[in-house]
Structure formats: C-alpha cells, structure tokens
Amino acid sequence: STQMLSPPERPREFRHPNELRQYLKELNEYYAIMGRTRF
C-alpha cells in the first residue's frame, strides 16, 4: 500500500531542547524519504 507520509507534527512550543532536537531529526528523516521517492 502506498501511503503518503505526512511531516512530523510540530509542537506548539518546545519545552525542552530534546523536543526540538527530536522534531528536527524526524523532519530531516521525512524530507530524506520524500526527496528519495520522486516519480
């Protein structure tokens, strides 16, 4: 099944540096995957 990935949800506020880091990591992975699968 081809499933459209959606970008990670951005928290309204980042309470901890780790939250921001985790979000950026997921965002990075999302764009890496999206950039690779161009048809």
From Swiss-Prot:
Disulfide bonds: none annotated. Neuronal somata and fibers. Keywords: Amidation, Neuropeptide, Secreted. SMART domains: PAH. The keyword Secreted applies. The modification Phenylalanine amide is found at F39. Pfam families: Hormone_3. One of its GO terms (biological process) is neuropeptide signaling pathway. This is Neuropeptide F. It comes from Cornu aspersum.
